[in-house]
Every structure is written in structure tokens, then in C-alpha cells.
Swiss-Prot record:
The keyword Disulfide bond does not apply. HAMAP family: Pept_tRNA_hydro_bact. It is an enzyme of class 3 (hydrolase). Hydrolyzes ribosome-free peptidyl-tRNAs (with 1 or more amino acids incorporated), which drop off the ribosome during protein synthesis, or as a result of ribosome stalling. Catalyzes the release of premature peptidyl moieties from peptidyl-tRNA molecules trapped in stalled 50S ribosomal subunits, and thus maintains levels of free tRNAs and 50S ribosomes. The record marks 9 as: Discriminates between blocked and unblocked aminoacyl-tRNA. This is Peptidyl-tRNA hydrolase. One of its GO terms (cellular component) is cytoplasm.
């Protein structure tokens, strides 16, 4: 069983913000396969699906970003999911908008949702898909920037990166070794 977690903030207010690009990827996978998040438990909305012979859970924590681990850890425990079978998808200020980067494991890099995930799982050893959102180019505080919406001129780059991230996740679910997926999709 695989667990795909998109990090973001719940509610309409945050729906199209940079910080919610992890949710965008889950939404892309749901739309591609006509799946729905039809379960609400573990402080998250999730769906249990089958893809290419593999059971897959897609999760959008509803805890707000900084508490994401509170949703992920109990769901993993309940379904007995090994950390090797988890991918966490989230925004990255240090990558330009439109770029994606996959990692086998690592630190939180200042990302509070990832920090919470590490704290609750007790390990840094989970796979990640990071989607670039760039940094503010003016004096905009980082918190205002990540909670802001993408400008229209970035729509194509964002859409492309979300689709590539979904493609990478699907390749991994189908059984391609994660290191090969990294080689194929890292930009």
C-alpha cells in the first residue's frame, strides 16, 4: 500500500495559494482517475484507491500546514503503512516556480509542514516531491508570499509542474524504483 500526501491548508481561503501546491498534485491525481476524497478521519480527507494493481491512499491533511504530521502519522499507523511507501508533496521556496525536485529523504529545510511530519513520524526517511514556488522578489514577507495566489503569468509553469509531479508519483506507484523516478523527473 502506498500513501501520497499533499501538504496544504484547508478551506476556500487557501485553495489556490502557493502553499497549497501539494493539494494541487493530489487534486490532479484525483481528477485524472475520477477519484474522490470520500473519507474524513485522522484530521484529514483521504481516498483509498487501486492503481495498476497497487492499493493507494491519497491524503490532504486538514490540520493546517504546521500540524500536518498530526494527520499523517495516525493514518499510517491505522493502515500499517511503512515509511518507505510514503511520498509527501509540498511547496519549496528555494526552487523556481515550475521546477520539481524529488528526494529520497532529508531535513525540513525550514518548511513547517515537513517539520511537523518529521516530528510525528520520528524519521526524516520519507520520499518527497518538492514543487518550486520561487521566492518573493520584493519586500513581501515570506508568510504573505506563500499564502498568496500564483500570478496569471505563472499558470502554465505551475500546471506543468503539477502534472510532472503526478506523472512521477504514478511511475513510482507502478513499481519504478524511486531513484530512477528521481533521475527521470528531477529538474
Amino acid at each position: 500500500m502506498k500513501l501520497i500526501v499533499g501538504l496544504g491548508n484547508p478551506g476556500r481561503k487557501f485553495k489556490k495559494t502557493r502553499h497549497n501546491i501539494g493539494f494541487f498534485v493530489i487534486d490532479e491525481l484525483l481528477q485524472r482517475h475520477k477519484w474522490k476524497l470520500n473519507n474524513s478521519k485522522f484530521e484529514g480527507d483521504y481516498s483509498i484507491e487501486h492503481f495498476d494493481g497497487e492499493k493507494v491512499i491519497l491524503l490532504q491533511p486538514q490540520t493546517y500546514m504546521n500540524l500536518s504530521g498530526k494527520s499523517i502519522s495516525p493514518l499510517m499507523d491505522y493502515f500499517d503503512i511503512d515509511v518507505d511507501d510514503v511520498i509527501v508533496v509540498y511547496d519549496d521556496l528555494d526552487l523556481p516556480t515550475g521546477k520539481i525536485r524529488l528526494r529520497q529523504k532529508g531535513g525540513h529545510g525550514g518548511h513547517n509542514g515537513v517539520r511537523s511530519t518529521i516530528d510525528h513520524l520520528g524519521t526524516k526517511d520519507f520520499k518527497r516531491v518538492r514543487l518550486g514556488i520561487g521566492r518573493p522578489t520584493n519586500a513581501t514577507p515570506v508568510i504573505d508570499y506563500v499564502l498568496g495566489k500564483f500570478p496569471k503569468q505563472e499558470t502554465t509553469a505551475v500546471t506543468d509542474s503539477v502534472e510532472k509531479a503526478a506523472d512521477a508519483i504514478e511511475a513510482w506507484i507502478k513499481g519504478k524504483p524511486f531513484l530512477e523516478v528521481m533521475n527521470d523527473f528531477n529538474q
